């Protein structure tokens, strides 16, 4: 079963949340010209890494803005989206979280990065997630890991 993936890279503007959300919307729209089955976004595209502002103040509160954007886009354009990851604030803690949506705009996967890269002090910015996620996109079994998590293959075994 062949699937067309569009993987989006972007110049994330650290601390400029409004710019980043606007830019992601533009890039999502542009990617439709490739007729993708699945669109994948980059890590921490909403805030960038190591923002100088206090991360808790600019992170997406409970992921609401990101979830609304991705769900609406997926449904309106009949495309699966793996939302890279965004900084999400929950109860005064920030997680590096990925959301996956099917073509109907339904949230089918949510995963928060479990292993921060401590030499880069990620663990000082983000709390670790506690569970893996497994979901299907167009009948294909999928799971999400984020960056350094790939060093822990037991997450997807």
Regions found by a protein language model. Name each.
Residues 1-7:
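Extreme N-terminal starter segment of soluble prokaryotic enzymes
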Residues 9-14:
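Short polar catalytic/cofactor-binding loops
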Residues 17, 26-104:
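Cys-nucleophile CN-hydrolase/nitrilase-fold catalytic domain and related Cys-dependent amidase chemistry
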Residues 19-30, 150-157:
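Short, acidic/polar
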Residues 62, 89-157:
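Active-site catalytic loop in hydrolytic enzyme cores
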């Amino acid at each position: 079963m062949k699937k067309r993936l569009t993987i989006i890279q972007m110049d994330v503007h650290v601390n400029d949340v409004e710019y980043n959300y606007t830019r992601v919307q533009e890039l999502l729209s542009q990617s439709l010209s490739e007729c993708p089955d699945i669109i994948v976004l980059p890590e921490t595209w909403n805030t960038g890494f190591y923002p100088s502002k206090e991360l808790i103040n600019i992170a997406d509160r409970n992921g609401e803005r990101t979830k609304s954007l991705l769900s609406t886009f997926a449904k309106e354009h009949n495309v699966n989206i793996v939302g890279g990851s965004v900084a999400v604030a929950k109860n005064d803690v920030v997680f590096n979280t990925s959301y996956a949506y099917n073509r109907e705009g339904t949230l089918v996967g949510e995963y928060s990065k479990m292993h921060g890269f401590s030499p880069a002090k990620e663990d000082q910015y983000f709390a670790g997630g506690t569970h893996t996620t497994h979901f299907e996109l167009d009948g294909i079994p999928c799971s999400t890991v984020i960056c350094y998590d790939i060093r822990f293959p037991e997450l997807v075994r």
